[in-house]
């Protein structure tokens, strides 16, 4: 019965469902996991890289983490070509705001603007939804550090800790148990690594399969976006007790 209603994005089924939007969300369920944690002194983003070839130029390529503006970054799960379009759109919106008002764009306003674009692709004929979910991490003078999650429908919400992608339920369950409101950035990194290990085969948890980024404030008050190097990731994995013997010899 559903096949009569799922060919177009603009037609509701008798149950009130938009099947193409639901299918887009299913595509994200097969993508590499991404986790975001809001700490009292920053925001931590971590993601599972699916492309781990030795031939890849890792120094110039990021699969999961992207900088949108000096004060906002995001982690991605889903179809990367769709994500690139939306990331570029967000960057342009942020620059236009800065040019017009001479100050950084508020984080939630940027997220809402991008989600309006995503929602439009669920409402007009001849278009398909963007098959990608985002975790946005940022800081502004209005609300301080913030973490938002958005899905293909254009819906978004603020979170203290959340996960998207494959096996995100396992990560969500661990975050519910272990997250504390006064968590520091250092402890948030350890919790993020621990939660991501639950979504992956823990024996394959190596720096080559991870991307870790942080958004925090420098003593000068400037927002800093930092992506960890493979060496830093290896050290963090060792400190967290997540590095397996097989990974150390590879």
From Swiss-Prot:
It comes from the Eukaryota. Signal peptide: none annotated. Coiled coil: none annotated. It is found in: Cytoplasm; Nucleus. CDD domains: proteasome_alpha_type_4 (cd03752). GO terms for biological process: proteasome-mediated ubiquitin-dependent protein catabolic process. Keywords: Cytoplasm, Nucleus, Proteasome. Transmembrane segments: none annotated. GO terms for cellular component: cytosol; nucleus; proteasome core complex, alpha-subunit complex. The proteasome is a multicatalytic proteinase complex which is characterized by its ability to cleave peptides with Arg, Phe, Tyr, Leu, and Glu adjacent to the leaving group at neutral or slightly basic pH. The proteasome has an ATP-dependent proteolytic activity. The 26S proteasome consists of a 20S proteasome core and two 19S regulatory subunits. The 20S proteasome core is composed of 28 subunits that are arranged in four stacked rings, resulting in a barrel-shaped structure. The two end rings are each formed by seven alpha subunits, and the two central rings are each formed by seven beta subunits. The catalytic chamber with the active sites is on the inside of the barrel. Belongs to the peptidase T1A family. This is Proteasome subunit alpha type-4. It comes from Spinacia oleracea.
């Amino acid at each position: 019965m559903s096949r009569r209603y799922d060919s177009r994005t603009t037609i509701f089924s008798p149950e009130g469902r938009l099947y193409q939007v639901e299918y887009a969300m299913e595509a994200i369920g097969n993508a590499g996991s991404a986790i975001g944690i809001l700490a009292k002194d920053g925001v931590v983003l971590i993601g599972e890289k699916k492309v781990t070839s030795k031939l890849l130029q890792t120094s110039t390529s990021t699969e999961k983490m992207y900088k949108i503006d000096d004060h906002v970054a995001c982690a991605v799960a889903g179809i990367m070509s769709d994500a690139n379009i939306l990331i570029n759109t967000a960057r342009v919106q942020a620059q236009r705001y800065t040019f017009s008002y001479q100050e950084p764009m508020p984080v939630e306003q940027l997220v809402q603007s991008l989600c309006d674009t995503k929602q439009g692709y669920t409402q007009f004929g001849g278009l398909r939804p963007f098959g990608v979910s985002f975790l946005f991490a940022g800081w502004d003078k209005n609300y301080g550090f913030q973490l938002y999650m958005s899905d293909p429908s254009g819906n978004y919400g603020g979170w203290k800790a959340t996960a998207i992608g494959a096996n995100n339920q396992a990560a969500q369950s661990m975050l519910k148990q272990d997250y504390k409101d006064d968590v520091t950035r250092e402890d948030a990194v350890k919790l993020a690594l621990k939660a991501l290990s639950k979504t992956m085969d823990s024996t394959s948890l190596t720096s080559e399969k991870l991307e870790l980024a942080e958004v925090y404030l420098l003593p000068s008050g400037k927002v800093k976006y930092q992506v960890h190097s493979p060496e830093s990731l290896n050290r963090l994995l060792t400190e967290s007790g997540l590095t397996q013997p097989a990974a150390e010899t590879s």
